[in-house]
């Protein structure tokens, strides 16, 4: 039944089937296949200020340096042979520039695979952290994972002063609780959202590489893409979280244990580093037995098409 619950969490269509015949349905197998295609020209985002150079006949003019600030999108117009560098353009400058990557000057949009070993390590770290929480901190975090997330996030997005005394206390306890959790290694998490919600968090900048994302509320994310997809309205945020104090892995104490939730700090500022279109196909095989009849094996297929928006925490 745990696996059936997993399908319920991943697919609304399967959820109805599993719920209707819960006592007679067994999951035999589930497989998912995902691929993604990049949108637009190759682009990078600077994580610190860099020096580029004006060009003459697509060759660098080292007599004319151009300073480019951090958190700027670089659109690649040409990659030079032999990894010699790139011909790029930047917002607000129509001229082509020469840039040579220095390894640590750009955000990396590469994700980190959350394998079973890494999830186990994170779970152990979370359990150790949770034992140090006060009763009020634990209660507030659990309340958030249940019925409290809307009221708490509304308070954070609006005015905490207008929120009830209980909600203000919950916010204080959640903050003090999750700020104690230290992520010991970089992590990639996922969040399902809508295009409307994404644009709102981008403050109407437009969905583009270099767009700056911010939400004063906590962001519930998950280690599992398919869990995020079940909450998505055609948009998945893929967030690369560096080591440090950026939130907490709360799954072991969550009321929705199994969703693999990493709760990000409210007000976390991020920047779009990659845009893709994602395609996922889910194959499920279940066995159903109705009263007085033979067991029937059913094969189900569901396809998803969605945007993948890769975000990195801003420097």
Q: How would you describe each model-predicted region?
A:
Residues 1-15:
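Sec-dependent N-terminal signal peptides of Gram-positive bacterial secreted proteins and lipoproteins
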Residues 9-11, 67, 186, 268:
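Generic detector of short, well-ordered, non-transmembrane alpha-helical segments enriched
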Residues 50, 101-109:
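Structured surface patches comprising rigid loops and adjacent beta-strands/short helices at the edges
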Residues 92-104:
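A short macromolecule-binding patch
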């Amino acid at each position: 039944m745990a696996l059936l619950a997993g399908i319920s969490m991943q697919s609304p269509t399967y959820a109805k089937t599993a719920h209707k015949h819960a006592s007679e349905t067994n999951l035999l197998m589930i497989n998912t296949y995902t691929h993604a295609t990049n949108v637009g020209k190759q682009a990078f985002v600077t994580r610190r200020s860099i020096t580029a150079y004006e060009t003459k006949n697509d060759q660098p003019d080292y007599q004319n340096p151009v300073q480019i600030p951090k958190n700027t999108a670089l659109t690649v117009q040409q990659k030079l042979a032999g990894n010699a560098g790139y011909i790029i353009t930047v917002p607000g400058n129509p001229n082509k520039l020469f840039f040579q990557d220095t390894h640590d000057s750009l955000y990396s949009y590469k994700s980190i695979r959350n394998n079973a070993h890494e999830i186990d390590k994170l779970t152990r770290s979370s359990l150790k952290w949770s034992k140090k929480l006060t009763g009020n901190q634990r209660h507030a975090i659990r309340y958030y994972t249940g019925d409290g997330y809307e009221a708490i996030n509304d308070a954070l997005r609006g005015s905490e002063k207008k929120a009830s005394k209980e909600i203000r206390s919950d916010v204080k306890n959640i903050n003090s609780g999750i700020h104690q959790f230290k992520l010991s290694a970089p992590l990639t998490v996922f969040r399902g959202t809508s295009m409307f919600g994404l644009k709102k968090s981008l403050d109407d900048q437009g969905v583009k590489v270099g767009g700056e994302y911010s939400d004063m509320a906590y962001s519930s994310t998950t280690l599992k893409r398919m869990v995020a997809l079940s909450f998505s309205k055609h948009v998945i945020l893929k967030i690369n979280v560096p080591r440090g104090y950026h939130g907490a892995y709360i799954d072991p104490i969550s009321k929705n244990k199994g969703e693999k939730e990493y709760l990000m700090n409210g007000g976390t500022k991020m920047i779009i580093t990659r845009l893709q279109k994602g395609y996922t196909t889910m194959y499920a095989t279940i066995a159903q037995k109705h009263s007085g009849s033979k067991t029937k094996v059913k094969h189900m297929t569901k396809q998803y098409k969605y945007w993948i928006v890769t975000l990195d925490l801003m420097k």
